[in-house]
């Protein structure tokens, strides 16, 4: 029975690529919750790194495979205890997939479209969380300008590094790909 279990070199490369994407997501989750959590900040705010990884992987792998990764990663993010994670499941899946579809249809796979999609994803996610807090927890409106917009801008500082890592990881097994 075990003699029929054979994994081709192409399948090994795909397994390696998705394992590295998952490890990059776990690294972002670790940085966001442990290193920058608990009161420690970067330039006065806590960066939101998980959506940066999700967007970069989604744009690199396309709408179908990247969308599956985005859904699983945002679900994992919600299950790990993210505040208002249920909204993040929707936002961090729909916006990167829509960005991947637009980028594949009209734009080249480059850094600037990825940066803009990351900006839109972070802004929509932070705005959704702000609106929930504003309506249900009676949060002051100035919180949006003092905390959430700087959080989006600080999170964008990490996007070039994540983009380069995802681009390098995405080249694993690329010459064997027929798509």
Where are these regions (language model features)?
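Terminal, non-globular segments
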Residues: 1-179
């Amino acid at each position: 029975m075990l003699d029929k279990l054979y994994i081709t070199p192409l399948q090994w490369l795909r397994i390696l690529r998705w394992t590295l994407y998952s490890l990059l997501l776990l690294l972002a989750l670790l940085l966001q919750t442990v290193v920058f959590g608990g009161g420690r900040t970067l330039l006065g705010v806590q960066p939101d790194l998980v959506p940066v990884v999700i967007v970069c992987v989604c744009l690199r792998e396309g709408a179908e495979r990247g969308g599956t990764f985005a859904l699983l990663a945002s679900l994992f993010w919600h299950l790990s205890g993210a505040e208002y994670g249920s909204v993040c499941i929707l936002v961090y899946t729909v916006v990167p997939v829509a960005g991947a579809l637009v980028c594949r249809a009209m734009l080249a796979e480059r850094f600037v479209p990825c940066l803009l999609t990351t900006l839109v994803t972070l802004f929509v996610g932070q705005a959704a969380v702000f609106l929930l807090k504003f309506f249900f927890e009676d949060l002051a409106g100035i919180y949006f300008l003092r905390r959430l917009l700087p959080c989006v801008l600080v999170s964008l500082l990490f996007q070039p590094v994540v983009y380069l890592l995802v681009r390098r990881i995405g080249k694993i097994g690329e010459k064997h790909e027929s798509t």
